[in-house]
Amino acid sequence: QNKQAAETFYQAMMGDDAVAAFEVGRDDLTEGYQMLADFKIASDKANSGDKQAAEDLYLALSKNDDIAPLYRDLARLLAARNVPNSRTADDVIAMLVPLTQGSGPFQGLALEAAAGADVQAGRIEAAKEKLGQIEQLADISAPLRQRSVELKKILGER
């Protein structure tokens, strides 16, 4: 079954319409490939402007206990980065709380996204505080650290 799942996944990804192919061939996929297909479908929805569908798919992934916590956290982060216009900054920040207040590989990116939501809501000091928290994290990439420093400068902190 793994070989068939791999072949189905590969053919869908190489085709002209991966989303349609995944919907038709979903039963041929193993759980892992189904998860990857769901991420691809959500990404395509986001890229086509259907933010509501993308958010719904990412949130469903984030709540799926059958997939590893790392992927659930990634789905939560992507849901927050692809919210429809009807969502408020507070909605985004609330969505990110499990990532911003916990430790993990997405904490810095979640803090950055939450800071962006604060800026959108006009809460510049709260945004600068979150950006400062990023700089205190030990395990973040140099580009994320640099973005945090630059964003704080743009927001008026030297």
For each predicted feature, which ranges?
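Alpha-helical tetratricopeptide repeat
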Residues: 2-12, 35-42, 73, 77, ...
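Extracytoplasmic/periplasmic/luminal assembly and interaction segments
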Residues: 13-69
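Soluble extracytoplasmic domains of inner/organellar membrane proteins
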Residues: 45-51, 55-158
